[in-house]
Amino acid sequence: MNQVLLEMRGITKTFPGVKALDNVQLTLKKGRVMALMGENGAGKSTLMKVLFGIYQRDCGTIRYQGEQVNYSGAKEALEAGVSMIHQELSPILHRSIAENIWLGREPLKGPLRLIDHAKMYRDTTELLKKLDLHLDPRTPMSELTVATMQMIEISKAISYNSKIIIMDEPTSALTGKEVDHLFEIIEKLKKQGVSIVYISHKMDEIFRICDDITVFRDGCYIGEREAQNTNHDELVQMMVGRDLGDVFPPPTAKPGKVRLEVKNLSVEGVFDNISFKLHEGEILGIAGLVGAGRTELIETLFGVRKHDVGEIWINGENVEIKTPQDAISHKMAFLTEDRRQSGLYLMLDIFANTSIAHLDAYRNKVVNVLDVRSMQKDCASQCTKLKVKTPGMAEKIDNLSGGNQQKVLLARWMLTKPDILFLDEPTRGIDIGAKSEIYKLMRLLTGMGKSLVMISSELPEVIGMSDRILVMHGGKLKGELDGKDASQQQVMSMAFN
């Protein structure tokens, strides 16, 4: 199908002091999935909000189904068949599935115009069946997983007879199986002639589900490609204006002596008989599928989990690590997989988030008072070194981009002066430009003699950044590869066997 459903041409949108969109364009064809790619701040979400009527454009034209349109708000866009599923879902948790879908549009009956609950539940059941969802429409949203809530949002879009559905980072909180189910739904929608705008940073998903790709950079339209006629490297170059080789900086240090040695480490039912060495100035990548035991291994080394058998040696000494405090005392640091859930204090400012793991070092033992001035100085210095972009240390951390939030977490741990850093999915949810900055920081750390263990589900990242790569499958270590010689095929072959 090549029928053009939506054309946006010459769209410009200016906010005070910032041109968010500068003469951009987008073409969406019927029954196809268009990826909209670009770094954070490239203008992707702004353009979608212009289409959805949340923002009014300064100039440009929007043609939908051959007619020029200008929606004054979300309600008008929805009624015209344009739906948007936001990254941060906002269901009414104490209301039922049916109530969330039909809110403000409930079927009415009788002269008193009362809500016809029986019809609403029947209609909801029919909607859910279209997505292979066998749920009781009376179920409160609070009892659903994030993935199921997302399916309810898609059901809601279908209830409007949507011809265009915008999905903003739809898989950010989904497991592998949940992603598979979402993609099955998208394929069904395509067959029904529905068009999808798919905003994501995840290259593997883009090439798996999208037909066409449009790239923005700094509020400008860079180009459009058919997914089958482009590749990862070209898209990175389009998004950041430089080649992939520049994204992964070369090693700055030659690995030195053994700093960490793990011998026959096991946790029953989780991973078994894991042994490896980590050297000074080295990045050791750990690859594997979801459920391979990678995160659990790092949690055990950091004292979050207790191991059943095995030994941990640091600088030639057999050590006992039973708690994270033990790990920190042995100069270890751990950037967790989900920074928003288990790393950041979102209601606090940058200063509090940076200093919180190292308060005792600034405590006057005699009068039990914190030296706040020294804390502020050191926190600001560390954030400056790591190039955290912020108006000041008093800025709420929730206002920062994902890349800058990750830098603040890194600054927090650098105050503890670690020698070994465990990085679990260090660039998850951040754009290509911010990833490049994180990679440079990782190389800076190895240049200082720090030892890094990196877990990543992105194979180009594992191969581009690792000196050596360990591959896990089903809780077992399947092999080791030299980073500079490894291929994605080799890694995946080990990960699946």
From Swiss-Prot:
EC number: 7.5.2.11
Keyword field contains Translocase: yes
List of residues binding ATP: 38-45
Domain of life (superkingdom): Bacteria
InterPro entries per the UniProt record, alphabetical: AAA+_ATPase, ABC_carbohydrate_import_ATPase, ABC_transporter-like_ATP-bd, ABC_transporter-like_CS, P-loop_NTPase
Cell compartments where the protein resides: Cell inner membrane
Topology relative to the membrane: Peripheral membrane protein
Pfam families: ABC_tran (PF00005)
UniProt-recorded Gene Ontology molecular function terms: ATP binding; ATP hydrolysis activity
Keyword terms: ATP-binding, Cell inner membrane, Cell membrane, Membrane, Nucleotide-binding, Repeat, Sugar transport, Translocase, Transport
Subunit structure comment from the entry: The complex is composed of one ATP-binding protein (MglA), two transmembrane proteins (MglC) and a solute-binding protein (MglB).
This protein's name: Galactose/methyl galactoside import ATP-binding protein MglA 1
